[in-house]
A protein has these predicted regions:
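Conserved core of the sugar-phosphate nucleotidyltransferase
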Residues: 21-30, 41, 46-119
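Conserved N-terminal catalytic core of the sugar/cofactor nucleotidyltransferase
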Residues: 1-38
Length: 119
């Protein structure tokens, strides 16, 4: 598989671990608690959002640190969220759904839902 070929680890969810309609934070929390190592920052890239670069992630983490934020999200130049989420571990370890200390970075990522979005 692509992940195997590129040395990317996969966290498989048990069938009854989460439901399709669960909030994204629930899914991310499940993944975080199934890691063997505790991280201070967790980066989530949605598979249907190509175009985000490692430099965007670095910029987001630096923005988080500089402004003492708990969450940074990526937005395109059109102001639409584009699948890049950078979370402080406190967000995943708490019962909060969203952060009160949120920032954003502009990236070239784009969220794809339909064929027309590829154009």
């Amino acid at each position: 598989s692509y992940c195997d070929e590129n040395g990317i680890g996969v966290i498989w969810r048990a069938k009854n671990a989460t439901r399709d309609e669960d909030k994204l934070i629930t899914i991310l929390r499940y993944g975080y608690y199934n890691l063997d190592i505790e991280y201070d920052v967790v980066v989530s890239l949605m598979a249907n959002c190509p175009g985000n670069q490692t430099s965007d992630i670095d910029n987001g983490i630096n923005t988080m640190i500089k402004h003492k934020l708990k969450e940074v999200r990526g937005f395109g130049t059109d102001g639409v969220e584009n699948g890049l989420m950078i979370l402080d571990k406190e967000i995943l370890q708490s019962n909060r759904d969203v952060s009160y200390y949120l920032g954003g970075v502009i990236t070239n990522g784009k969220e794809i839902h339909y064929k027309k979005d590829l154009l």
